[in-house]
From Swiss-Prot:
Gene Ontology molecular function: NADH dehydrogenase activity; oxidoreductase activity, acting on NAD(P)H, quinone or similar compound as acceptor; quinone binding
Record key words, sorted: Cell membrane, Membrane, NAD, Quinone, Translocase, Transmembrane, Transmembrane helix, Ubiquinone
Superkingdom per UniProt: Bacteria
UniProt keyword annotation of NAD present: yes
Segments crossing the lipid bilayer: 15-35, 88-108, 117-137, 159-179, 191-211, 250-270, 273-293, 313-333
The protein's name: NADH-quinone oxidoreductase subunit H
EC number, UniProt record: 7.1.1.-
Function as written in the Swiss-Prot or TrEMBL entry: NDH-1 shuttles electrons from NADH, via FMN and iron-sulfur (Fe-S) centers, to quinones in the respiratory chain. The immediate electron acceptor for the enzyme in this species is believed to be ubiquinone. Couples the redox reaction to proton translocation (for every two electrons transferred, four hydrogen ions are translocated across the cytoplasmic membrane), and thus conserves the redox energy in a proton gradient. This subunit may bind ubiquinone.
Lineage of the organism: Bacteria, Bacillati, Bacillota, Bacilli, Bacillales
Coiled coil: none
GO biological process, one term: aerobic respiration
Gene that specifies this protein: nuoH
UniProt topology in membrane: Multi-pass membrane protein
Pfam families the UniProt entry points to: NADHdh (PF00146)
Length: 333
C-alpha cells in the first residue's frame, strides 16, 4: 500500500504521506493500547470472579483507561537526585521507539501494510531486541538497586529467549523459502503452519511471552521481589512510555504470531466470503486472549527455572525442529 501511494504521488508530497500514515498508525496503536488494557482488566476480573472497571465511562468502564492516562500525564515528573539525568530521560524513549517501529512491516491484510520489505521477519527480530537497551539504561540510570536488578534480569531474559524464538521461526523460513512476511502468509493459503509446525509454534509462543516480560516470565518487574523492577523510580508520563512499549509489543507479537502460524488473513475453509481483515482481527484477538489467560493462570517462575527452561528445554527443542523440518524437506519435497 505504501509503495503504491508513493509511486502515484509527487516527490514533494512523500513526506506528508509518510507523516500522515505514521500518525494514523500511531493513533490506531494507541487506541488498541487504550482498550486492550481495558479488555485485559475486564477479562482478568471475569476470571477472578470480579467485575473489573465499571465506574468511569458507564457500566462497562469504557473511559477507565482514558482516565488513567490523564492521571499519568498530570502526575509530577520526578527524577532522583543520584540518577544519571540524560540517560534517565532517554531510556523510556529508547524502550518505546523500537516497539512502534516493528509495526511498519507487519501485513494486516494483502493490501494493508506500511512497508513491504524483503526481509520483514529479520527486521522485526533485529529491531525488537533494541527495547532491552532502554530497559537496561533505565535501570542503570535510576541508581537504584531494585531497578538495576530488574534491568539485569531483563537483559538475561532477552538473551535466553531471543535465541529460541529466532531458532523456532527458522522452520517456517525453511518451508517458505523467504523472510518476507507476505510470502509467509501466502504459503499458508491451503494449510496454516500451526498444523505443519506445532513444535515451532509452542516454542515460539512460550519465548514470545518471555520476550513480552509477561506472567509467568515477568521477573524484570516482579512486584513482590523488586517493588516495580527496572522502572521503580519512574512516574507520570515517563512510566507511561514503558507501559506503552509493553502493550505495543503485545499488539506486535500477537500480529506476528497470526502471520507466522495462523495464516494471517486467510480464511477457514468454505468461509472465504468473510473479508480477510475480519479473519486477521479474529485470530489476533484469540492470541491476545490467550496471553491474558496466561497472566491470570500461571505463577511467576524463579530466575533459575526461567534460565533452565530457555537453555535446556526450548533451545534444544527448537534445534530439533529445524533438523526434522530440513530432513523432511530434503527427502519429500
Amino acid at each position: 500500500m505504501m509503495e503504491q501511494l508513493l509511486n502515484s504521488a509527487p516527490s514533494w508530497t512523500n513526506l506528508v504521506i509518510f507523516f500522515g500514515l505514521g500518525l494514523a498508525l500511531l493513533f490506531a496503536v494507541l487506541a488498541f493500547v487504550t482498550y486492550g488494557i481495558l479488555a485485559e482488566r475486564k477479562v482478568m476480573g471475569f476470571m477472578q470472579g470480579r467485575y473489573g472497571p465499571n465506574q468511569v465511562g458507564g457500566r462497562w468502564g469504557l473511559l477507565q483507561t482514558v482516565a488513567d492516562v490523564l492521571k499519568l500525564l498530570l502526575k509530577e515528573d520526578t527524577i532522583p537526585k543520584a540518577a544519571d539525568k540524560p540517560l534517565f530521560i532517554l531510556a523510556p524513549i529508547i524502550a518505546f521507539a523500537p516497539a512502534f517501529m516493528v509495526l511498519a512491516t507487519l501485513p494486516f491484510t494483502d493490501a494493508f501494510q506500511f512497508a513491504d520489505i524483503g526481509v520483514g521477519l529479520l527486521y522485526y527480530i533485529a529491531v525488537s531486541g533494541l527495547t532491552t537497551i532502554g530497559v537496561v539504561a533505565g535501570g542503570w540510570a535510576s541508581n537504584n538497586k531494585y531497578a538495576l536488578i530488574g534491568a539485569m534480569r531483563a537483559a538475561a531474559q532477552m538473551i535466553s529467549y531471543e535465541i529460541p524464538l529466532v531458532v523456532s521461526v527458522l522452520g517456517v523460513v525453511l518451508l517458505t523459502g523467504s523472510l518476507n512476511l507476505n510470502d509467509i502468509v501466502e504459503a499458508q493459503k491451503d494449510v496454516w503452519y500451526i498444523f505443519i509446525q506445532p513444535i515451532a509454534f509452542i516454542v515460539f509462543f512460550i519465548a514470545a511471552v518471555a520476550e513480552l516480560n509477561r506472567t509467568p516470565f515477568d521477573l524484570p518487574e516482579a512486584e513482590s521481589e523488586l517493588v516495580a523492577g527496572f522502572h521503580v523510580e519512574y512516574s507520570g508520563f515517563r512510566w507511561a512510555f514503558f507501559m506503552l512499549s509493553e502493550y505495543v509489543y503485545l499488539f506486535a507479537m500477537a500480529a506476528l504470531t497470526t502471520i507466522l502460524f495462523l495464516g494471517g488473513w486467510h480464511p477457514v475453509m468454505f468461509l472465504d466470503f468473510i473479508p480477510g481483515a475480519v479473519w486477521f482481527a479474529l485470530k489476533f484477538s484469540i492470541v491476545v486472549f490467550v496471553l491474558i489467560w496466561f497472566r491470570v493462570t500461571f505463577p511467576r517462575l524463579r530466575a533459575d527455572q526461567l534460565m533452565e527452561l530457555g537453555w535446556k528445554v526450548l533451545f534444544p527443542v527448537a534445534l530439533l525442529n529445524i533438523f526434522v523440518t530440513a530432513l523432511i524437506q530434503e527427502l519429500f519435497f
